[in-house]
Design a protein with these regions (language model features):
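Cytosolic catalytic domains that perform sulfur/thiol-centered chemistry
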Residues: 1-277
């Protein structure tokens, strides 16, 4: 299984290749629009993917997967088809890009990579950027097909917990333990019974890249994960869970992602919630 990551050096060497599409997937929890940063500095040839606008507009939950038709139309307008080699990055390093990597893979893209270290590493190395509004991109056809094995809904989540599945929560420890309030109003504090906690920052190295090899494996094992068993990732709203999914993919370990995450589970009255470690 090939790595889900691409280095800044490798991407720089491939700029301008036919069939290479670069996506700025920057999104911020505080609601800031990522587009101004995209227009201030972006990797040459990049297009901007609006995570909020590309989620399911009919769901009351944040960031839910859209239908294949909606996603395919959105990607087509960005000039991306499912056969392209797609590189996704964000302006933080590794934060929202893995969510869009996961969306693309789950909805039919065949070759998607996350830029390791993102735009901060690219800029720190003095690599070329573009500014201003991007040039219009020719429309493409993206044939989106949902991989149902990649995503978990609440019914499947209940069944998985009842069967003792490994559930790995990417939220900060204080939120997981119920010691800190959730950033979204109306959600209970705590976690699903039996869930494990691996805050997403624990799989990111000091330089903003994803940990690799033994260091990455140790992060999962230290959280209690058995890497010989399947894993379901979750978080607050399905964004940072994808960072754990990315880490598992780097270890050639498949995973599924609970799309509703805590925004769904913690907002219902008929779901079990526990506090503490």
């Amino acid at each position: 299984m090939s790595s889900p990551l691409i280095s800044t050096a490798d991407l720089a060497a491939r700029l301008g290749e036919p069939g290479l599409k670069i996506i700025d997937a920057s999104w911020h929890l505080d609601g800031r629009d990522g587009r101004p940063d995209f227009e201030a500095a972006r990797i040459p040839g990049a297009v901007f993917f609006d995570l909020e606008a590309s989620s399911d507009a009919n769901s009351p939950l944040p960031h839910m997967l859209p239908s294949p038709d909606v996603f395919g139309e959105r990607m087509g307008r960005l000039g991306v088809c499912e056969r392209d080699t797609v590189v996704v990055y964000d302006t933080v390093g590794i934060r929202s890009a893995p969510r869009v990597w996961w969306m693309l893979r789950t909805l039919g893209a065949r070759n998607v990579r996350v830029l390791d270290g993102g735009l901060p590493k690219w800029l720190a190395e003095g690599r070329a950027t573009e500014t201003g509004a991007p040039r219009p991109t020719p429309h493409a056809t993206f044939r989106a097909v949902l991989d149902r094995d990649a995503v978990v809904d609440i019914r499947q989540m209940r069944d998985a917990l009842a069967q003792g599945a490994q559930v790995l929560d990417a939220r900060a420890a204080a939120r997981f333990r119920g010691e800190a309030a959730e950033p979204r109003a109306g959600l209970r504090s705590g976690h699903m019974p039996g869930a494990l906690n691996l805050p997403f920052l624990d799989v990111i190295a000091a330089d903003g890249t994803l940990k690799r090899g033994a260091d990455l494996e140790a992060a999962f094992r230290d959280a209690g994960v058995d890497l010989d068993r399947p894993v379901i990732t979750t978080c607050g709203s399905g964004v940072t869970a994808a960072i754990l999914s990315l880490g598992l993919a780097e270890l050639a370990h498949p995973s599924r992602l609970y799309d509703g995450s805590w925004a769904e589970w913690g907002g219902r009255e008929d779901t079990a919630v526990v506090t503490g470690p």
